[in-house]
Amino acid sequence: MEIENHTLITKFLILGLSDDPELQPILFGLFLSMYLVTLLGNLLIILAVSSDSHLHKPMYFLLSNLSFIDICFISTTIPKMLVNMQSQIKDISYIECLTQVFFFNIFAGMDNFLLTLMAYDRFVAICHPLNYTVIMNPRLCALLILMFWIIMFWVSLIHVLLMNELNFSRGTEIPHFFCELAQVLKVSNSDNHVNNVFMYVVTSLLGVIPMTGILMSYSQIFSSLFRMSSTVSKYKAFSTCGSHLCVVTLFYGSGFGVYFSSSVVHSTQRRKVASLMYTVISPMLNPFIYTLRNKDVKGALGKLFNRVASSPSCINDIRNKLLLRSVRQIL
């Protein structure tokens, strides 16, 4: 097969989840439903946190940011997959692939950082409650999130610039449902040693460091829980951490599963399933996990629904509050 320079490559072939034509309508309906549920669930959390003054706390500020990132995360991959399923065309342009790699890495990294920051927030709230408002002040949270955005922007940009130097064959097939960086590197025809080294170093750092922070936070939290004499206090403290633990387990478990399965089990289908867990299932379930046992969020959602049902001007009020909150954060 003739090797073409990357500047002449105009498209890749995304093999998707299945080659069976009869399954395409079923998969299309399934993933469209999951995508819409994810958008609705996470948007409701953002609106609930923004519209209720009782939720203007660091914990819920981080939760609303996580919901925004989850919307962006799933929107990086699923819409293109749905278009390909509907049109029965598996093409993705070279520019689209680079763009998908760029934004996918940004949002995956932001998910990582936010989960770590949320674990630290829970640690401060339980282990240092008297200093909570001093340590977890809104300005610090906003600065940390901005710093994470800057870090992930440059990391993703370097990934894309290195990938842009690779050569690919005409008609290259990517055995995945989106342009995952590791899969794109595997199908290149040029020396990708630098790309692989950078990818594994970044993946290790972005996986090990945040995970270490989460483990250290929860080790201190559990130590404090064991020292509590009141059962009610233990239950209340654990209930604030249970949802976050579920999300962390789902995200990191499936994320690490992708890389372990890539190196140990050479099964493309298993790798796709593992990728689905943290790219689709995790963003979809997060709103349900966080609201299932959270009375404050459920109460805010109830008030939001009541206001929408009773007042036609409610949407304008919410929009104005969102704009006002954005201006305050900038200032």
UniProtKB/Swiss-Prot annotation:
Q: Which residues cross the membrane?
A: 26-46, 58-78, 98-118, 143-163, 197-217, 245-265, 272-292
Q: Which superkingdom does the taxonomy of this entry point to?
A: Eukaryota
So which residues have sugars stuck on them?
A: N5, N167
Q: Which InterPro entries does this entry report, sorted A to Z?
A: GPCR_Rhodpsn, GPCR_Rhodpsn_7TM, Olfact_rcpt
Q: What is the membrane topology listed in the Swiss-Prot or TrEMBL record?
A: Multi-pass membrane protein
Q: Do you know which PROSITE patterns this protein is assigned to?
A: G_PROTEIN_RECEP_F1_1, G_PROTEIN_RECEP_F1_2
Q: Cross-referenced Gene3D superfamilies, in alphabetical order? A: Rhodopsin 7-helix transmembrane proteins
Signal sequence span is none
GO CC annotation: membrane; plasma membrane
State its location(s): Cell membrane
| Summary of the function given for this chain in its UniProt record | Possible olfactory or taste receptor.
Q: Which PANTHER family match?
A: OLFACTORY RECEPTOR
Write out the similarity annotation.
Answer: Belongs to the G-protein coupled receptor 1 family.
- Protein name (record): Olfactory receptor 7D11
- Organism from which the protein derives: Mus musculus (Mouse)
Q: Which gene encodes it?
A: Or7d11
